[in-house]
Structure formats: structure tokens, C-alpha cells
């Protein structure tokens, strides 16, 4: 058991996050957005939200995801509440698994 907090999310890659992307991705980050990328960004923001364990988060403005290239597994950097986070992800068949531990 870890003495650190953990946030984890798993999502099926689908068109739904792409359709809802304006609710969690800023307008300037919509360029070249695919269903895979939108799903992975949603997963990252959900993992941070679950790590935070409190409400009142604006997914567009409060959680910033750095640029990334999708691979089978990797790390994505994010900023939340003026702190940096490293999110670990893995593509498992048609799903993304993302977790943060801090």
C-alpha cells in the first residue's frame, strides 16, 4: 500500500470524448484532435480529478495537458493547481489506462 494518493481512469477509445471535447479541452488545443487523442486527454483529466478527491474543477482551465505523441504506453505531463504531474498511460486493446501517483 502506498502512502501517496492515486488517481486512475480507464476509458474505451470512442467518438464520444471527441464530440464533447469543448467541455474539457481549450479551443486552441482542438487542432488535429482525433478520437484517440481526445479520449487520452479525457482520461488524464479524469485521473487528476480522482487524485484531487474534491469537486469544483474546471476541466478546460484548471488542468493543462502538455503536448504529446500517442504510443502504446508512455508519460504525459500536466499542470494542476500550479503543480506539475506526470501521468502514466497504456493503451490496452481499445482502451486507455491512465494513472497519477503523487
Annotate the PLM regions:
Residues 1-102:
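Core catalytic alpha/beta fold that binds nucleotide/phospho-ligands
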Amino acid at each position: 500500500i502506498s502512502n501517496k494518493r492515486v488517481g486512475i481512469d480507464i476509458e474505451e477509445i470512442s467518438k464520444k470524448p471527441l464530440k464533447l471535447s469543448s467541455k474539457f479541452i481549450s479551443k486552441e488545443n482542438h487542432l488535429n484532435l482525433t478520437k484517440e487523442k481526445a479520449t487520452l486527454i479525457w482520461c488524464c483529466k479524469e485521473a487528476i480529478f480522482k487524485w484531487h478527491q474534491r469537486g469544483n474543477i474546471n476541466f478546460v482551465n484548471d488542468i493543462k495537458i502538455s503536448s504529446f505523441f500517442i504510443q502504446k504506453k508512455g508519460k504525459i505531463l500536466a499542470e494542476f493547481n500550479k503543480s506539475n504531474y506526470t501521468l502514466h498511460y497504456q493503451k490496452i486493446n481499445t482502451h486507455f489506462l491512465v494513472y497519477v501517483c503523487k
